[in-house]
Curated annotation (Swiss-Prot):
Protein name: Large ribosomal subunit protein uL11
Subunit structure: Part of the ribosomal stalk of the 50S ribosomal subunit. Interacts with L10 and the large rRNA to form the base of the stalk. L10 forms an elongated spine to which L12 dimers bind in a sequential fashion forming a multimeric L10(L12)X complex.
GO molecular function terms attached to this record: large ribosomal subunit rRNA binding; structural constituent of ribosome
SUPFAM superfamilies: Ribosomal L11/L12e N-terminal domain (SSF54747), Ribosomal protein L11, C-terminal domain (SSF46906)
Domain of life: Bacteria
Any single GO CC term annotated in Swiss-Prot or TrEMBL for this entry: cytosolic large ribosomal subunit
GO BP annotations listed: response to antibiotic; translation
Keywords, comma-separated and alphabetical: Antibiotic resistance, Methylation, Ribonucleoprotein, Ribosomal protein, RNA-binding, rRNA-binding
Family: Belongs to the universal ribosomal protein uL11 family.
Gene behind the chain: rplK
Coiled-coil intervals, chain numbering: none
Entry-linked Pfam families: Ribosomal_L11 (PF00298), Ribosomal_L11_N (PF03946)
Function description: Forms part of the ribosomal stalk which helps the ribosome interact with GTP-bound translation factors.
Organism: Streptomyces griseus
InterPro entries (alphabetical): Ribosomal_uL11, Ribosomal_uL11_bac-typ, Ribosomal_uL11_C, Ribosomal_uL11_C_sf, Ribosomal_uL11_CS, Ribosomal_uL11_N, Ribosomal_uL11_N_sf
Amino acid sequence: MPPKKKKVTGLIKLQINAGAANPAPPVGPALGQHGVNIMEFCKAYNAATESQRGMVVPVEITVYEDRSFTFVTKTPPAAKLILKAAGVDKGSGEPHKTKVAKLTAAQVREIATTKLPDLNANDLDAASKIIAGTARSMGITVEG
């Protein structure tokens, strides 16, 4: 007989700085209420995201009824990648009136390539359009 599947008791989604997870809020309270060993998660997450230090990396944590967990790291948010590529700290307060930066089509394609596994797109062109739309809504002009 095949082993029984563990019963899932919770799904937690967090956005944490890569390699910098610690038991302080927001990580501690979110995991604590599900009974997860917080330090164990922090060590595993920091080890998994060490190469991406300085970026915000979303993580999906699946908690099982025996209080064990698994987690999947995602690609950094598109907005963060766009801001980094454009070299600005934040988007425009009035995106359709005030433009804060410009991105080239090549930069948009590069970001789309990075984000492709997490986007709802079948090919690179569709992913590029999604990224370009996000950039426009932040007051960043896309050229090309």
